[in-house]
């Protein structure tokens, strides 16, 4: 049976991604000085303006306007002709402390209040909700091919802009890849869509030629392309006005880009700007860690795990697994292995993945999962042998 599946990615200069990177830059700056700081930082951008808001409880001081300007400069919006300038944009901040009602549940979990002695029970989940982790062996990154290929194309767009290969490119851009599957395995790429902001001096014909030569051919293996592969490069014909001048942006608006490109389910919670006591982030990272190690251990070809939490309670209220018919053992047996090998209380996740560190801005663009260009703890295959002992 053949079917098509499509996923998209965006570059670091996309308005929503600017916001994610600013929020995580603030988080990293606080965790660097105060590892126990509580951060829920949201950012909005529009023409000539950035607003940073949220709830932050910390013992340290960070210069938020300076962080904002440094982040925007690093992305590439450093002159007015790009429609957004790190030096001249206004920066507005509105920061409150974390709610005492939330803090009391995180500081002392329900289990601790009942007298349970394990110190990891003292850290309650920062919110209720469900988080999903996913892995598949269809790529070496254990990610679905559509999102993995879309991310690589987006990163390449930024690379050829910054290294001067295509100096007329601007920071904003999007990619989209449609993969054809046969009996559950990727066999070819059916369509590639790339929209990239550019200077007014260049024409579409040149952009199409350069993107095919310096982006697509460099990234996409030739065996996945054929005479029927369709290419859509700047299909509107012109993309000069972009970034916050073209669209306003908000933190947390690219949650499917951040995860599995729609191939796996999503619990709805965004990542950026949240410290690791927020299970929206830490438990989603843990779920990816669990799923990737299970697939790498040969438990299944494809696996999705759901974790669910109650605010102020340490232990997950439920753990569910789906192997989509690819499991070598039953889903119930896999859940049993998960409970034996992994401790999924928030305090244990923070400890085992060492999450109270400034490691978040680096994943705020080009995906939080499947990253081989950086070392992030939830991508490590450090539980494979232990899992195999229980199969």
Curated annotation (Swiss-Prot):
Pfam families: S-AdoMet_synt_C (PF02773), S-AdoMet_synt_M (PF02772), S-AdoMet_synt_N (PF00438)
Signal peptide: none
Keyword Mitochondrion (UniProt): no
Annotated K(+) binding sites: 42
Record region (Flexible loop): 98-108
CDD domains: S-AdoMet_synt
Residue sites binding ATP per the record: 14, 172-174, 238-239, 247, 253-254, 270, 274
Organism placement in taxonomy: Bacteria, Bacillati, Bacillota, Clostridia, Eubacteriales
PROSITE patterns associated with the record: ADOMET_SYNTHASE_1, ADOMET_SYNTHASE_2
Name of this protein: S-adenosylmethionine synthase
Entry keyword set: ATP-binding, Cytoplasm, Magnesium, Metal-binding, Nucleotide-binding, One-carbon metabolism, Potassium, Transferase
Purpose: Catalyzes the formation of S-adenosylmethionine (AdoMet) from methionine and ATP. The overall synthetic reaction is composed of two sequential steps, AdoMet formation and the subsequent tripolyphosphate hydrolysis which occurs prior to release of AdoMet from the enzyme.
HAMAP family according to UniProt: S_AdoMet_synth1
Cofactor binding comment, as recorded: Binds 2 divalent ions per subunit.
Residues that, per the record, bind Mg(2+): 16
Chief site of localization: cytoplasm
Residues reported in the UniProt entry to bind L-methionine: 55, 98, 247, 278
Family: Belongs to the AdoMet synthase family.
Cofactor: Mg(2+); K(+)
Assembly behavior: Homotetramer; dimer of dimers.
UniProt-listed Enzyme Commission number(s): 2.5.1.6
Gene3D superfamilies linked: 3.30.300.10
Reactions the enzyme catalyzes: L-methionine + ATP + H2O = S-adenosyl-L-methionine + phosphate + diphosphate
Example GO BP: S-adenosylmethionine biosynthetic process
Pathway in which this enzyme or protein is active: Amino-acid biosynthesis; S-adenosyl-L-methionine biosynthesis; S-adenosyl-L-methionine from L-methionine: step 1/1
SUPFAM superfamilies: S-adenosylmethionine synthetase (SSF55973)
Location relative to the cell: Cytoplasm
Encoding gene, per UniProt annotation: metK
């Amino acid at each position: 049976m053949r079917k098509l599946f499509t996923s998209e990615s965006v570059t670091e200069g996309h308005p929503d991604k600017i916001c994610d990177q600013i929020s995580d830059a603030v988080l990293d700056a606080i965790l660097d000085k105060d590892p126990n700081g509580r951060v829920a930082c949201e950012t909005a951008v529009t023409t000539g303006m950035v607003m940073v808001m949220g709830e932050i409880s910390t013992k340290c001081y960070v210069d938020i306007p300076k962080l904002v300007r440094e982040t925007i400069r690093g992305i590439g919006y450093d002159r007015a002709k790009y429609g957004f300038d790190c030096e001249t944009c206004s920066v507005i901040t509105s920061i409150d402390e974390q709610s005492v009602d939330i803090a009391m549940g995180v500081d002392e979990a329900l289990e601790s209040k009942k007298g349970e002695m394990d110190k990891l029970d003292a850290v309650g989940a920062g919110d209720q909700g469900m988080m999903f982790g996913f892995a598949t062996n269809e790529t070496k990154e254990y990610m679905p091919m559509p999102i993995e290929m879309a991310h690589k194309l987006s990163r390449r767009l930024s690379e050829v802009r910054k290294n001067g290969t295509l100096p007329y490119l601007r920071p904003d851009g999007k990619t989209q890849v449609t993969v054809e599957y046969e009996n559950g395995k990727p066999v070819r790429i059916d369509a590639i869509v790339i929209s990239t902001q550019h200077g007014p001096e260049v024409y579409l014909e040149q952009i199409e030629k350069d993107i095919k030569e310096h982006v697509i051919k460099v990234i996409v293996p030739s065996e996945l392309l054929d005479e029927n592969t369709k290419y859509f490069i700047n299909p509107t014909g012109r993309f000069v006005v972009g970034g916050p001048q073209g669209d306003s942006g908000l933190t947390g608006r690219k949650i499917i880009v951040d995860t599995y490109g729609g191939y796996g389910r999503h619990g709805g919670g965004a990542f950026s700007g949240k410290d690791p006591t927020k299970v929206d982030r830490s438990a989603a990272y843990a779920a990816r860690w669990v799923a990737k190690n299970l697939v790498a251990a040969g438990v299944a070809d494809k696996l999705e795990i759901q974790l669910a939490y109650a605010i102020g309670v340490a232990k997950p209220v439920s753990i569910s697994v789906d192997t989509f018919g690819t499991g070598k053992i039953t889903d119930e047996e896999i859940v049993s292995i998960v409970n034996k090998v992994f401790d999924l209380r928030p305090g244990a996740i923070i400890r085992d993945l060492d999450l109270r560190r400034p490691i978040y801005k680096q994943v705020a663009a080009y995906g939080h999962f499947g990253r081989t260009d950086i070392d992030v703890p939830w991508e490590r295959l450090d539980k494979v042998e232990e899992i195999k002992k229980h199969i």
